Structure formats: structure tokens, C-alpha cells
Amino acid sequence: MQIDSDLQNNLDTLKKTLGQNDDMMFYTFAFGDSRQKACLLYIDGLTENKMLAQYVISPLQKEALAHKECSIEDLSAFFFGFHHSVVSTMKEIEQLVFSGQAILLADGYRGGLAFDTKSVATRSLDEPSSEVVERGPKIGFIEKLRTNTALLRERTSDPNLVIKEMTLGKRTKKKIAVAYIQDIAPDYVVKEVFKRLKSVNIDNLPESGTLEQLIEDEPFSIFPTILSTERPDRVESSLLEGRVSILVDGTPFALIVPATVDEFIHSPDDYSQRWIPMSLVRLLRYSSILITIYLPGLYISLVSFHTGLLPTRMAISIAGSRLNVPFPPFVEAFIMIFTIELIREAGLRLPKPIGQTIGLIGGVVIGQAAVQAQIVSALMVIVVSVTALASFTVPSYAYNFPLRIIRIGVMISATALGMYGVIMVYLFVIGHLMRLKSFGQDYIIPIMAQPGQDLKDTVIRIPTMFLKRRPTRNDPEDNIRQR
């Protein structure tokens, strides 16, 4: 329905659809020499009243309009310098007013003006809680989309940085922003991102995690194929490598596509520290992943099937420690891993000081009590504890879950088939990873199949002076980053 030039007719129509809301405000006033009637529509609490008074009402009342104008564009000229747009239908008014904008309707004007006076409580910029680095920027994204895009603009002063906005959610009308560098990001990736976003048909988009599940390549895989981050510097570096970022209003977590398995293991401060220690740290992380997945399964297979592979003294020591334990190795390991997962989850849900105390005291007390009660052996406590510690070295929290799930599968296979079961799970996981795609790009590439340039920044990192080209696996338009 089009907006009529008669103000009273417009208000009668709007009050039928919006008037049942107690926080819906209809502020009427007069302006100009002819004292034309006007009305401001806004949601109390979503709109900054001082901005309305200073930038909307005051300029109108100061202008000496002698007669009614015939075009809403003429009225729009009085608000030069203040962000606003022209609306022409009642449906537009309903959508914009509930998103926090104020609508100006004036008698004699066929149309209205929408002013961006949204006022939403937000927190100040702070260090990301989920991606703490020893050296690097200490500022993370917040829940306000415009602040997040400004942080990107501030860090990337490249005129080729493109930020396009769109609205998702049939009812909530959630704003999202897609960021990419035009002369670096491959066109086919950008087109694929917009294609998937436009295919999303949902009532509400509460968080970027929901969007991630709607546009990912492999919804039935346990491995994430989209990287999420709170750090503007990480988004910046990804954009400069030819990736695309998606930011959602109301959440501090940005999405980065396409993502490879390396991205979940690397940390932002890998590039702010010297290359030798950081290369060793990366090797430590990759080793920790293997320990997280395979150590309990290897222990079970060696104790249950392949004791001949152990040194004689070690085999005797293990047998002695398990002499009075009533459970087989798998049950031992499962009890301890289940207990550690309980402690981990309790530590996350409880207030931070209490959670840290529960994690420390709970692990020590329960482990000691289990050994003294001869429910588990002391060596099993050591194995499970080392496994849990190794899992904490993975920078990506989302990548921890698949590793822990695979660990249970390795334990079951080791219990049934020994070392052959461990090898079978290993081959299955590698095959599954090689099958995965992330927005048309391979999720994992065998080391021997990677170009030499990409090998310089995978398991280890060579000096920055030699990283002159962008990773070819991202297929960037501009391949040179250092001349």
C-alpha cells in the first residue's frame, strides 16, 4: 500500500497495524510558516530521542516553508548530512520502524523519510575471550555490525575492500555484511557466497553459528568447513589471502570462507613472533592433535593385544598397576575421559572463578581417588591427562569437538581390532578429510600435492621475507603480496 499525501489517512492506517504496541510512539508537530502537520513514528527505546530532536525536528522548525511541497525529495533536502532514505509504502515503514529507524510523515507529501537514529546498548571494544594471543592486537569484534565493519575499514585502508550488506530472516530482518577485496578474492568464491546467502530462507538468524550451518558444504560432517573468529586482524589477513568474510549483526563472531584444515590449527600470533619458535610451536600443535586422537587408543591396543611390542620392564610395570583394576582398558579410559568431559563442561557453565577452581580441584581429587579405589590404574590417569592437555593446544575451539569424537572411535576400534583398528580409523579420517570441500576448494591437500609456495606456511613457517606470494590454494586474483 502506497503512502498517501493525507497525513491523517496514513496515521489511521498505521495505528490499525502498529497501534497495539505500547512502545510505538506517534509524535505529531507542526513546521513551516503554514504550520504543516507532521508525525514522527519510532519505537521507544530503540531510537535516540536527542538525535531526533537535534537533526530532524529542529531543522524542520527552523525552515520558513511558505507552502506545501509536492515532492518528498524536496523535504529530504533539509536533512543534508544526516543519513536518511525515502520510503514510499506502508510495508517499508513497518519493516524499518521495528529495526530502530524513525519515520517522518508530513501532510501533503506522498512518501516518508526514514532516519537512522537507532540506539542500542552495546559493550565497549575488548580483547577477544576465545582467541587470546601473547603478542598482537587486543581488540575484538562486538555485537554491533557497523562497529565491526568500521574496524575492518580501519585496519584495511584498501579502496578495493568491498563491504556489501543484505538482510536475512523473514521476521527478524537481521543485517549481515559480506567483505572481500575485489582484486584478490576469486570471483567464483564471491558469487558462491552470495548464492548461498540468498538461498537462506529462515524466520530468525540469531547468531553467525546458525548461518554457518545453513551455508556450509558438509552439514553431516563432524569437521567445521567455515572458520569463525572474533579478531579483526585475522579477518584482515584472510581477506588479503583471497578469502571472503561474513559478519552478522548481533554477534562478535565473523565467518571466513573458504577454510582449510590448516586455518583451524594456525594462530594469529604465529606471524607476530619469530619464525623458528613459531615453527616449533606449530609442530607441537600438530603433534598434540595426534596425541589427542590416538594416545588412548594406542594404549588400549598395546595393553590388550600387542604387549610384545612393549619393553619387558614396561609391560611388567603396566601389568602390576592393573593387577587389582576390575575393568578392561577401554572401560578405564572411558570412565576417565567421561569424567574429564564433565569437568570441562562444568567449568564452562559455572562462573569463571568457580569454574577454574572446579577444573583444577575436581581433576586432581577425582583422579587420585579413582587410583586409590583401584577403579583405574595410575598409568591410565596419566594417559588421559596428557590427552586432555594436548587437546587444549588446538587454537580453534570448534575444532576440538571432532578430535574428541574421533578419539572415542579410535578407542572402540582399538578394543576390537587392536593396532589394526587404530590404522583403519586413521585411514578413514584422512579419506574423509580429502573428500571435504569448502566453497569449492579442497579442505585438505596432501603435503606432496601442495605447491612449494604453500608449503612455506603450513606445518612450519619460513621467514616472512620469503612469503612473497599468497597461498595458491585460495586461487587469488592477485598472487603477489610482497615485492
UniProtKB/Swiss-Prot annotation:
Q: Which GO terms describe its cellular component?
A: plasma membrane
Protein's membrane topology: Multi-pass membrane protein
The species is Bacillus subtilis (strain 168)
Would the keyword Cell membrane turn up in this protein's UniProt record?
A: yes
Which cysteines share a disulfide bond? none
| Keywords recorded for this protein, A-Z | Cell membrane, Germination, Membrane, Transmembrane, Transmembrane helix
Where this protein primarily resides, as one coarse class?
Answer: membrane
Segments spanning the bilayer are 289-309, 323-343, 353-373, 375-395, 410-430
Q: What family is this?
A: Belongs to the GerABKA family.
Where does the signal peptide begin and end? none
Name this protein carries in UniProt: Spore germination protein B1
Source organism superkingdom: Bacteria
- Provide the GO biological process annotations: spore germination
InterPro entries reported in the protein's UniProt record: Spore_Ger, UPF0353/GerABKA_families
Q: What compartments host this protein?
A: Cell membrane
Specify whether Transmembrane is a keyword of the entry. yes
Q: Which gene encodes it?
A: gerBA
| Pfam families (alphabetical) | GerA (PF03323)
